[in-house]
């Protein structure tokens, strides 16, 4: 049911009346897009689980409820996680069909027991020791991009640094050959609006074309990597797992993780790091602290992920009749679980709206999920954020936000990061002599 406003007397599927607050909830515009966690402050207090007629979803806002949903996949299935939240137009479906687009299951939307079997076999490249081997390359790429703007005195952190670098790192991690990185970069950002947004028909048509082209390209890349016995990266590892376990991994599965992996490893890190820089620079004393003492950066990262994470909400489907926060959810009921709201729940985080890099339990945020579906790439994302903050704070500690700028975000339910973060500094004051004009 998709309406701008719930009609008079509308009820949830369980027959309960829908409150005015629930009827007015619109995740595609207004308060949720400005600040999703603050927009649900009243809901956390008065109506922590409510039915949204606009979405046809139950919205869950409190920490403990969301934690239990994550940890009970036998009751709350992840199967709808990457379903389009806005129905796909016939024209867009035809376009996708012309590319033989066949989206299937990936780790993010798989049920047990196959999820755990596949995750165990695909996990090795994500283990901390293996991810750590990428740090010198990440640092090299970050500094290469910083070199391009360091003497200018002004930059857009997103356009000049945070968009490109995570994309390059993601593709290196996946095992994409150097000559294909530029093509992957062009196609890799199609998914957010299409899957989690509210695109118009024209937008669906445009994005479907890009997604179809990338789907074809992803399949060709898998074939290319299969033919290279010396290829390194996550996709070559998955190809080897297919050789050893053909019953668990077919070609469509490999194409799906190539297709989805670019998005998962790229955009979420771009958004998380953009949010972190904005938050730290708006809280100047915290920025100055990490510039003076870089050992504080890991704690600052956890607080940034809690306070303004890039993954705002996930979705689940009730497998059986169940209850969340004393609200009955019928089998088949769909839930939007808003981690951004959970991360501001004062039952878990005292003074939750205060940004505090010394917070003792910031790492208990739910931005990366919890349980068997914890984000597979969390270690890589944290490493990239650490290197970004270390290098920028070392070379541009005097950097500040351009005054008066307005921050914009792509309207969608689940992912959040500023489209631009404009900063400025006096290049004559750059602490590294070689960085001065």
Swiss-Prot record:
What EC number(s) would the UniProt record show? 1.14.-.-
- Per UniProt, heme binds at 375
Task: Tell me if ATP-binding is a UniProt keyword of this record.
Answer: no
One Pfam family from the UniProt entry? p450
Query: What PROSITE patterns would the database entry show?
Result: CYTOCHROME_P450
Molecular function, one GO term: monooxygenase activity
EC category: oxidoreductase
Supply the induction statement.
By EPTC (S-ethyl dipropylcarbamothioate).
Q: Which UniProt keywords are given for this protein, alphabetically ordered?
A: Heme, Iron, Metal-binding, Monooxygenase, Oxidoreductase
State the needed cofactors, names only: heme
| InterPro entries per UniProt | Cyt_P450, Cyt_P450_B, Cyt_P450_CS, Cyt_P450_sf
What family does the entry list?
Answer: Belongs to the cytochrome P450 family.
PANTHER family associated with the record: CYTOCHROME P450 YJIB-RELATED, P450, PUTATIVE (EUROFUNG)-RELATED
Q: What does this protein do?
A: Degradation of thiocarbamate herbicides.
**What's the protein called, per UniProt?**
Cytochrome P450 116
The organism encoding this protein is Rhodococcus erythropolis (Arthrobacter picolinophilus)
Give the encoding gene's name.
Answer: thcB
């Amino acid at each position: 049911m998709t309406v701008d406003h719930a009609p008079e007397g509308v009820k949830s599927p369980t027959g309960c009346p829908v409150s005015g607050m629930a009827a007015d909830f619109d995740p595609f515009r207004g308060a949720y897009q400005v600040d999703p966690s603050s927009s649900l402050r009243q809901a956390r207090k008065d109506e922590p689980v409510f039915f949204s007629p606009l979405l046809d979803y139950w919205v869950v806002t409190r920490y403990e409820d969301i934690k239990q949903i994550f940890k009970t996949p036998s009751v709350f299935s992840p199967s709808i996680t990457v379903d389009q939240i806005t129905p796909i137009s016939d024209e867009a479906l035809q376009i996708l069909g012309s590319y033989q687009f066949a989206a299937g299951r990936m780790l993010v939307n798989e049920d047990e027991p196959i999820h755990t079997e596949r995750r165990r076999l695909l996990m090795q490249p994500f283990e901390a020791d293996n991810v750590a081997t990428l740090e010198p390359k990440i640092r090299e790429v970050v500094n290469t991009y910083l070199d391009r703007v360091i003497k200018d005195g002004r930059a857009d952190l997103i356009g000049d640094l945070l968009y490109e670098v995570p994309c390059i790192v993601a593709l290196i991690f996946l095992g994409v050959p150097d000559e294909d990185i530029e093509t992957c970069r062009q196609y890799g950002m199609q998914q957010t609006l299409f899957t989690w947004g509210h695109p118009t028909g024209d937008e669906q048509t445009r994005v479907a074309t890009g997604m179809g082209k990338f789907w074809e390209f992803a399949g060709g890349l898998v074939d290319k990597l299969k033919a290279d016995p010396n290829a390194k990266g996550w996709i070559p590892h998955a190809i080897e797992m297919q050789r050893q376990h053909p019953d668990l991994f077919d070609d469509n599965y490999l194409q799906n993780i190539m297709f989805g992996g670019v998005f998962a490893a790229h955009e979420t890190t771009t958004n998380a790091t953009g949010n972190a820089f904005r938050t730290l620079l708006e809280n100047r004393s915290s920025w100055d602290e990490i510039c003076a003492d870089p050992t504080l950066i890991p704690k600052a990262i956890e607080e940034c992920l809690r306070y303004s994470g890039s993954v705002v909400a996930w979705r689940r489907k009730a497998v059986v009749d169940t209850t969340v926060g004393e609200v009955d959810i019928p089998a088949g009921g769909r839930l939007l679980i808003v981690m951004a709201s959970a991360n501001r729940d004062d039952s878990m985080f005292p003074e939750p709206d205060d940004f505090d890099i010394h917070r003792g339990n910031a790492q208990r945020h739910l931005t990366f999920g919890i349980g068997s579906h914890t984000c597979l790439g969390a270690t890589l994302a944290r490493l990239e954020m650490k290197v970004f903050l270390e290098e920028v704070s070392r070379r541009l500690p005097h950097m500040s936000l351009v005054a008066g700028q307005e921050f914009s975000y792509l309207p969608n339910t689940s992912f959040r990061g500023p489209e631009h973060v404009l900063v400025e500094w006096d290049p004559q004051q750059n602490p590294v002599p070689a960085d001065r004009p």
